[in-house]
Each structure stands twice: as structure tokens, then as C-alpha cells.
Regions:
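Beta-strand-centric surfaces of beta-sandwich/beta-rich domains
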Residues: 28-210, 215-320
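Bacterial N-terminal signal peptides
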Residues: 10-20
């Protein structure tokens, strides 16, 4: 073979390899497959670029892809990438109208502006609510999806892109008995010094609620998360998660739903470094001690509760 022939062959091989790598990357970064609901809506968030060794929390703004109101009794969320959390919010002001788009938003959304609807920390969540209990969505309403993808430490995003696909399954209006709401509990006082430590938050509600589900949330130093009922004096443990990976999303069976007047949660940490970690959004450099819970009945179609500990004071707010 001549020099030109050999060079041409090498060029062709390199070109083919490049094409194959591009095709492979394209295939890898498609959104995860999730069958669409027969009755309901599906929407996709992504791709969210994630640099090697970095993490990104991004907010994607869009409208519910349905002109009609939806009463949702079943939820599916499927994620690809190193997911730390995926949240879905609506604005407290029903007239808020943002242009579709996305931006970095490393901290939790402003609770005076946005209300949590759904939260997942797993690659796949399928959750059917008890009969007659639904999340209500207004047709075409403004929504925000907050996604936190990581490619460092205990989480990896091999393709360099994160995706989240949501399915909301519609229930006929005549079958709706109660509406569900979300509880966002957050300890902004959390401090994790070297060695072993823990942080506890206690929250009482203005009225008793029936718990549908709950999950705990911390960063890389977290080794155990417990949650329990709280009546202002004492309580009973109802949730325990050990380790960091795949925090359990505890669902209560329809015949075993607890009625609670409040919740308490404790995060236990082991910090093997000489650094002290404080509250903040980044998994490597900050810590969290958050609780996400879901309940019913609500006073209206869009009620949520926030419970925030800051400067030693716990503030509980019911948002309508």
C-alpha cells in the first residue's frame, strides 16, 4: 500500500471512529424511556449539561402541557445521570407567567414565591396515591422543575448530560375526594464539624394531617436519617435511612396512614476531614438536613407547608 493509501485508510478509520463515538454519545444522552399515560401528560426536562468533576442545579421553566385541569392520582419520575434531587414546583401567584427556559439555581427556590409539588431522589419513582386522593394541576399553569445533577464524589453522570421525565396520570374528577400537599422541611442551621455529629429539627403543624409519604435528604457526610411524629413533647420513629445512596421514598398503605400533628427529623454525620461543613447547595462543600413529606387533606387545591429552622427558630408556614 502506498503512503497516500495508508494515510487515507487511517483518515477513514479515524472518521468512522469519530462518527461511531458521536452516535454513541447521542444515543447515551437521549432521555430515559417512559411510556406515556393514556390519560394524563408527560414532559421531559433536559438535557442538563454536567461537566466532569462538577455539579449543576438547574431550574427549567415551562407550562403544564395540558389546556385542561388535571387531578393526578399516580406519578412517575424517571431520571438519567447522577441525580441528587428532582423537584417540581408551582408559583404561589397563579398569574405568574415566565418565558420557557432554564437557568442555574443552586439554592432552594424562594418559598414565598414557589410551592413544592413533588420531590424524588431516585433514578425511578412510581407512586400511586390512595383512592380518591390527588394532586391538582391547573391547565397550562406555570411550573418549575429543579434538577440537581452531580459528577463527583459518590455520584456520576457518565454521559455528561442529565435528564428527567415526568408522567402525571389523570383521575376522573368525579372520583376525587381529597387533595394532597407537600411539606418541605429544611434545617438551615446545620453544622457538621470533624468527627461524628447530628442535627435535629422539630416542626408542629397548625392542624393534624394524614401522611402519604416521606423521604430524607443530606449530602456526602450523611450516614443516617431518621424521622418521626412530633406532638410538641414526644414522638415515634416512622422512617430510617442508612447511608447516602438511594434514599427510601416511604409510602404509607391506604389502611396504615398515620395522622400527625408534627414531624421531627435527625441527620447523623461522619466527617472524616478537618473541615467544618455548613448549610449550602453543593454536595462536596456543604451539607443539608432536609425532609420532604406529602399529606392530605388540604384546605384548597394547592396547599403546601414549609418548616424552616434558622438561627435556632423554627418557622412553619401554610401556603395556599
Amino acid at each position: 500500500m502506498t503512503a497516500i493509501g495508508r494515510a487515507g485508510s487511517v483518515a477513514i478509520v479515524a472518521c468512522l471512529a469519530s462518527m461511531l463515538l458521536a452516535a454513541s454519545a447521542s444515543a447515551d444522552t437521549k432521555p430515559p424511556t417512559l411510556r406515556r399515560p393514556r390519560s394524563g401528560v408527560q414532559f421531559t426536562v433536559g438535557p442538563v449539561p454536567v461537566e466532569r468533576g462538577k455539579e449543576i442545579t438547574e431550574c427549567t421553566y415551562f407550562k403544564l402541557p395540558s389546556k385542561r385541569d388535571l387531578d393526578v392520582n399516580k406519578v412517575q419520575i424517571k431520571v438519567s445521570g447522577g441525580t441528587h434531587h428532582v423537584h417540581l414546583y408551582r408559583p404561589e401567584d397563579p398569574n405568574l407567567d415566565l418565558a420557557d427556559g432554564h437557568e442555574a439555581c443552586n439554592f432552594a427556590l424562594d418559598f414565598s414565591v414557589w410551592q413544592l409539588i413533588l420531590a424524588s431522589q431516585n433514578l425511578e419513582l412510581t407512586w400511586r396515591l390512595p383512592p380518591g386522593v390527588t394532586f391538582h394541576f391547573r391547565g397550562g399553569e406555570q411550573l418549575a422543575a429543579q434538577t440537581h445533577f452531580v459528577d463527583s464524589g459518590l455520584l456520576t453522570t457518565p454521559t455528561g448530560e442529565g435528564w428527567a421525565v415526568f408522567n402525571l396520570f389523570k383521575m376522573p374528577k368525579h372520583r376525587v375526594k381529597s387533595y394532597a400537599g407537600a411539606i418541605f422541611g429544611q434545617d438551615r442551621d446545620v453544622v457538621v464539624p470533624p468527627g461524628s455529629s447530628s442535627a435535629t429539627t422539630r416542626c408542629t403543624f397548625p392542624k393534624p394531617v394524614k401522611l402519604l409519604a416521606l423521604t430524607g435528604h443530606y449530602h456526602y457526610r450523611g450516614v443516617e436519617f431518621t424521622a418521626g411524629t412530633w406532638d410538641g413533647t414526644t414522638g415515634t420513629e416512622i422512617y430510617r435511612q442508612e447511608g447516602y445512596d438511594h434514599p427510601a421514598f416511604l409510602r404509607f398503605a391506604a389502611n396504615d396512614i398515620p395522622t400527625v400533628t408534627g414531624l421531627q427529623w435527625t441527620c447523623s454525620y461522619v466527617n472524616t476531614t478537618t473541615n467544618t461543613f455548613t448549610f449550602g447547595p453543593f454536595t462536596d462543600n456543604n451539607e443539608h438536613c432536609n425532609l420532604f413529606a406529602f399529606y392530605y387533606p388540604t384546605a384548597g387545591t394547592h396547599e403546601t407547608i414549609t418548616c424552616v429552622q434558622q438561627h435556632g427558630i423554627v418557622t412553619t408556614v401554610v401556603h395556599q
